């Protein structure tokens, strides 16, 4: 991120982290109660999500 600012813990509760069997896969953002927006390379058949990290 160019020119970004540090944020406080729990300031952005819409942050989603995706994990696969190897560990961290990528991150995304919750855009409504059912959909997470991520980058195209975040494609995996088996993953877990953690919201509000």
From Swiss-Prot:
Q: What are its GO biological-process terms?
A: proteolysis
Q: Where in the cell is it found?
A: Secreted
Task: Give disulfide pairs as residue numbers.
Answer: 26-42
Q: What's the pH dependence, according to the entry? A: Optimum pH is between 7-8 (at 40 degrees Celsius).
One annotated GO molecular function: serine-type endopeptidase activity
InterPro entries (alphabetical):
Peptidase_S1_PA (IPR009003), Peptidase_S1_PA_chymotrypsin (IPR043504), Trypsin_dom (IPR001254), TRYPSIN_HIS (IPR018114)
Question: EC number(s) in its UniProt entry?
Answer: 3.4.21.-
Active site per UniProt: 41
UniProt keyword annotation of Methyltransferase present: no
Swiss-Prot/TrEMBL keywords: Disulfide bond, Fibrinogenolytic toxin, Glycoprotein, Hemostasis impairing toxin, Hydrolase, Protease, Secreted, Serine protease, Toxin
Report the PTM annotation: N-glycosylated.
Query: Temperature-related activity notes?
Result: Optimum temperature is between 40 and 55 degrees Celsius (at pH 7). Activity decreases at 60 degrees Celsius.
Q: Which domain of life is it from?
A: Eukaryota
Q: What class of enzyme is it?
A: hydrolase
Question: Which GO terms of the cellular component aspect does the record hold?
Answer: extracellular region; secretory granule
**Tissue distribution of the protein:** Expressed by the venom gland.
Please state how the activity of this protein is regulated: Inhibited by the small molecule serine protease inhibitors phenylmethylsulfonyl fluoride (PMSF) and benzamidine.
Purpose of the protein:
Snake venom serine protease that has fibrinogenolytic activity. Hydrolyzes the alpha-chain of fibrinogen (FGA), without affecting the beta- and the gamma-chains.
User: What family is this protein classified in?
Assistant: Belongs to the peptidase S1 family. Snake venom subfamily.
Q: Give the PANTHER family listed for this entry.
A: KALLIKREIN-1, KALLIKREIN-RELATED
Q: How does it assemble?
A: Monomer.
Q: What is this protein called?
A: Snake venom serine protease LmrSP-4
Organism equals: Lachesis muta rhombeata
């Amino acid at each position: 991120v160019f020119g970004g600012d540090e944020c406080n813990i729990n300031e952005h509760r819409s942050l989603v982290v995706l994990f696969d069997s190897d560990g961290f896969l990528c991150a995304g953002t919750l855009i409504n109660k059912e959909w997470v927006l991520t980058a195209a390379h975040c494609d995996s058949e088996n993953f877990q999500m953690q919201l509000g990290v």
